[in-house]
Every structure is written in C-alpha cells, then in structure tokens.
Design a protein with these regions (language model features):
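N-terminal active-site beta-alpha-beta segment that forms phosphate/nucleotide-binding
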Residues: 6, 12-128
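Conserved phosphate- and dinucleotide-binding cores of soluble alpha/beta proteins
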Residues: 98-201
Length: 201
C-alpha cells in the first residue's frame, strides 16, 4: 500500500472528515487574504496577469470566460480590459439556482449588476455558448498537482463536467498554494495554476 497524503494522515489522526478539512483550509486562506493590503493584492494580481498574457492559450483565445473577483481574489478587471483591447470576447458567470451560466460583457458599468454572494454578475442578456473558450477560474487553495479546493458550492465542478472542452486556467496567489490539499475523485483539476511567481502544470 502506497504512502498516504499528509492531509489523509492528519484526517485519520485527528478524526476530522474531508468536509471539515476543507472548511479549516478555507478559514486559513481567508485570514491570509485579509492580511494583505489592497495595494499588495493589486501588485500581485498584475504579476499574475503578465503570466497569463504570455501564455499561448491566452494569445490564441477568441473568447475568454473570466470571473469577477471579490474579497482579495486575484483581480481580473485589468485582464478583462486587456482582452477587450485585443479584440477578444469576454464572458463572466452568473449563478442561476444550482447552475452557473456565462454571459458576455462589454462594459463593467452597463452589463453587470449585484448578484449572488455579494459578487457582481452579468445581466441575463447575452449568453455565451463557446465550448473551446479559455476559462479563467478562481479557487480557495491549490496544491502542486493542481488539485483545487473551491468555495463549497460545486459550481465550477458541475460546469466543467458539462463543458469538458474548455481550456482551464486557475488564478491564485502563492500563499494559496499548499504542498497538498484535500480533494475528492470528482473534483476537476485545471490544466494550469498560475500565481505571481510560477505556473503549475
């Protein structure tokens, strides 16, 4: 029998189940996010943006599925503005019940409204149905094998299961990357994880 991951050993040792492990990790990352200033988050986000911009997958993409950042996630507005400037179409997600759907936006002022979980969401007027788009996704934590811990709603897992041909890149800060994170077999890994310092493939 092979060696068990560290988080499994800790889980068995402490009698903590997978759900509780993820909950504790989310709390840890939330504190780390709050410990950084807005300016620090902005500068680190610009470094992530530069790495995304250099990727062939980004350069060749005609459609980018992005996200509207909140609560000290990797900022996306500068990246979205860049994509618009380069003639790419940009869509962002809207939560519809238990589903997540993407809608095109061409303006932060005209095409967005207050939505679920305090996140700005697109108005339901221009749905996106491109199956080979580049999808930039957030997350709470990742490990060096690209396993992802999300926010617990399962929206991205369900969306990616239904749209397997999307090119997926997760954006994160280095403090969100751990040696190992708890994961389940149905969790879908992004093709790459990009931080301000490196790209995990």
């Amino acid at each position: 029998m092979g060696l068990l991951p560290i988080w499994v050993k800790n889980m068995e040792k402490n009698g903590i189940d997978l759900k509780e492990q993820k909950k504790q990790l989310r709390g840890e990352i939330r504190k780390l996010r709050k410990s950084h200033t807005d300016e620090e988050i902005h500068q680190m986000s610009l470094a992530v943006l530069e790495r995304v911009q250099a990727l062939l997958e980004y350069q060749e993409a005609e459609v980018v599925y992005a996200y509207m950042d909140c609560r000290h996630e990797v900022e996306t507005r500068d990246l979205i503005r860049l994509a618009w400037k380069e003639g790419k179409r940009v869509a962002v997600p809207r939560v519809c019940g238990q589903e997540m759907k993407f809608y095109y936006i061409t303006s932060f002022e005209d095409d967005l409204e207050d939505g679920s979980f305090g996140i700005r969401e697109p108005k339901e007027k221009n749905p996106a149905y491109v199956e080979d788009a580049l999808l930039l996704m957030p997350g709470v934590a990742f490990d060096e094998k690209r396993h992802r811990v999300g926010y617990g709603g399962g929206f991205y897992d369900r969306f990616l299961e239904a749209h397997p041909d999307l090119v997926t890149i997760a954006l994160a800060f280095e403090f969100q990357v751990k040696e190992e994170v708890p994961f389940e077999t149905f969790d879908i890994r992004p093709a790459r994880v990009i931080t301000e310092r490196r790209t995990l493939t």
